Amino acid sequence: MHQPLTADLNPADEVVAVYDRTGNPIGRAPRSVVYSGGLWHASAGVLVRTGDGSRIYVHRRTDTKAVFGGYHDCLAGGVVDPGETPQETAIREVGEELGIFGTADQPLQLTEIARISWDGEWNNSPLRCHLFAFELRYDGPMAHQPSEIAEGWWWTPKELGAHLQDPSWPFVPDSRALLADYCWS
């Protein structure tokens, strides 16, 4: 497979890592090309739970998001940038979206909880993504990124599980697939 071209990029179009079907990084391309061409890429997200694990942070994406706008999610995350690992992406995204940052003395302690390759669809186009989920136990403050998150709240695993059982509930489908086998207790 050839490496996607990066010439003549629109400077406003974010460049993301492109992967092959088996999960190996093979190049880079503008996000718009990845989405319009159904190219494989990778995404990483963080499931934030209270320190005791009794609550999970759930949020609603802003209506202006390019993909799954207005849908609910329990992962703060995004696409993997060229040269970035999924864990680095997860750390970057939980900082950007929820204002949760580690320090040199106390880096964020993420635990990988799931990974899948999702060959889905959005707006009648293929959407192919290698998905990585990490868990973070956290009891501190949060600050939503206004362009990404409209609102958020803490739910028990039972509350979230009940909502996920309802296929009509507008929940990000790739996160739903990624966490299908996750133990919510």
Swiss-Prot record:
It comes from the Bacteria. A motif (Nudix box) lies at residues 77-99. PROSITE patterns: NUDIX, NUDIX_BOX. Pfam families: NUDIX. GO terms for molecular function: hydrolase activity, acting on acid anhydrides; metal ion binding. Its EC number is 3.6.-.-. The keyword Magnesium applies. Keywords: Hydrolase, Magnesium, Metal-binding. Residues 39-177 form the Nudix hydrolase domain. Mg(2+) binds at residues 93, 97. Its cofactor is Mg(2+). InterPro entries: NUDIX_hydrolase-like_dom_sf, NUDIX_hydrolase_CS, NUDIX_hydrolase_dom, NUDIX_hydrolase_YfcD_pred. Gene3D superfamilies: Nucleoside Triphosphate Pyrophosphohydrolase. Signal peptide: none annotated. Belongs to the Nudix hydrolase family. This is Uncharacterized Nudix hydrolase orf19.
